[in-house]
């Protein structure tokens, strides 16, 4: 098997992995399923691990995976919450690492889309992934970027385990407020997500207010209040929303412990915790454990 270094040093190998991954990232964990336009239905598992934004932070990714390797090779399912590129110095390597994990452990790994795996009409700032492509592969970077965008468009947006939790990058869409089922709210069965639902899933953040939502200072998505959280969880009869998107030191909670934000790119943001959330199944429920992995600067 080619290593991360070999793949990211050879444009044809990098392109090959990107192209191959477009069909692999939609494979659900064993016992689960996938519904158009990009909803992973998770099976029950003894435990789940949630890894937040990585943003090209290969050192934090290595530290977390080294610490969690027994769970990866055991019975846990690992859900990555998106934002693999932009900001950090090892963006190609970090994206390659998670794609190789999905390729080799596809029944244990879920790769969700973040707002930094953007549609062409909603580019984040910074979006320096194209710059890193161009400095590595000066003659082929435009083609590689288009291939990357094709891959990003195939990444699932949501993972749901009914009766327990919703995992996504930003927040639930406001359609939960007027829907009678989560299938309606998340546009299950459609060929593609509407632009509004996609934007809110990728860009929204929680706010500690007992309201529906406020305008977001990000310029995309919304600030969703407790009423949105409560309605989203009512639709799946669940207990938790698990998300990334915010640069917190490890793991934080909102809405009386119903919303968990996980952030893992510790070195890029000069934080001392690479956050991981672990859910362990016990007595007919999943018990949350916030983990702080101390990052190593060694690669």
Predicted segments with their positions:
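Feature recognizes metal-dependent phosphohydrolase scaffolds
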Residues: 1-299
């Amino acid at each position: 098997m080619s290593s991360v270094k070999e793949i990211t040093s050879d444009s044809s190998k990098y392109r090959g992995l990107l192209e191959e991954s477009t069909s692999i990232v939609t494979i659900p964990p064993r016992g689960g399923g996938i519904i158009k336009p990009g909803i992973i239905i998770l099976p029950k598992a003894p435990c789940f691990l949630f890894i937040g934004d990585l943003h090209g932070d290969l050192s934090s990714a290595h530290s977390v995976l080294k610490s969690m390797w027994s769970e990866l090779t055991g019975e846990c399912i690992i859900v990555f919450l998106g934002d693999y590129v932009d900001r950090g110095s090892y963006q190609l390597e970090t994206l390659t690492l998670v794609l190789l994990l999905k390729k080799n452990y596809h029944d244990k790994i879920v790769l969700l889309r973040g707002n930094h795996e953007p549609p062409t009409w909603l580019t984040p700032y910074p979006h320096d992934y194209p710059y890193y492509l161009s400095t590595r592969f000066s003659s082929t970077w435009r083609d590689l970027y288009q291939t990357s965008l094709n891959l990003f468009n195939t990444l699932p947006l949501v993972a749901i385990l009914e009766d327990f939790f919703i995992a996504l990058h930003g927040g639930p869409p406001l359609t939960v407020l007027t829907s009678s089922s989560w299938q309606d709210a998340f546009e299950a069965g459609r060929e593609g997500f509407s632009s509004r639902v996609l934007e809110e899933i990728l860009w929204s953040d929680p706010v500690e207010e007992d309201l529906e939502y406020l305008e977001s200072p990000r310029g995309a998505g919304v600030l969703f209040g407790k009423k949105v959280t409560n309605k989203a969880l009512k639709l799946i009869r669940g207990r938790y929303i698990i998300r990334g998107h915010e640069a917190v030191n490890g793991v934080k909670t909102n809405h009386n412990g119903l919303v968990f934000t996980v952030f893992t790119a510790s070195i890029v943001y000069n934080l001392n915790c690479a956050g991981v959330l672990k859910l362990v199944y016990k007595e007919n429920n999943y018990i949350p454990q916030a983990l702080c992995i101390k990052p190593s600067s060694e690669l």
